Amino acid sequence: MDYVNLGKTGLKVSPLCLGMMSYGSSQWRDWVLDEDASRPLIRRALESGINFFDTADMYSLGVSEEVTGRALRDFAARREDYVLATKVFNPMGDGPNDRGLSRKHIFDAIDASLRRLGVEYVDLYQIHRWDYQTPIEEAMEALHDVVKAGKARYIGASSMFAWQFAKAQHTAERHGWTRFVAMQNHYNLIYREEEREMIPLCLDQGIGLIPWSPLARGFLAGNRTR
């Protein structure tokens, strides 16, 4: 496996990242593999040289993080041998502060994710969506503090407009806070809107691109027709 730098960081990742949305609990979605069915695939990924694993707190409502963490602890020789990413934003409960990018929720969410994953830190902590109800200054400072607390090595973003991503980066730069190093955007041969603004922005700024749904949820793999 040839490894590449994630954006302009020094972090080495496999060109293929195993997305963990399909691993967790079939009670959440009927297309999700339960733990026993997930583990052989995760093990095979590690044996093939894949060292990059991306999950989120909301995948199977936390079960994906638990399954991912247990498998990586069992199959990887050392914590240093894999790059672990997770995300924050989506609802994790019924409470008004169980979602979003408020300072409160980010702090609560990173601790909960680390407990479920069974690790002391994640390599990449990503905001899953843009929060229209929280000032970006609050979110970026909270993410900076997560990094400074040693709970995340880098931060990234996912699924937003290019102007929003640029605003977040400018906010962080203006205040001397940690900036995003990666963008996880929706991109494949069917959905190519990201070629208009987001991808050129990221290439210009040295931001790592982690496209989600690269096979268009199976359409490009030939196993779905609708």
Regions found by a protein language model. Name each.
Residues 1-82, 120, 148:
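N-terminal binding-site loop/beta-alpha segment at the start of enzyme catalytic domains
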Residues 3, 134-226:
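Beta/alpha (TIM)-barrel catalytic core signal, keyed to glycine-rich beta->alpha loops juxtaposed to Asp/Glu
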Residues 6, 18, 38, 45, ...:
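Conserved, mostly hydrophobic/aromatic
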Residues 22-36, 92-107, 128-133:
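Active-site mouth loops of central-metabolism enzymes
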Residues 31-45, 99-118, 141, 165-170:
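Short, acidic/polar
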Residues 75-101:
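Structural motif corresponding to the early beta-alpha repeats
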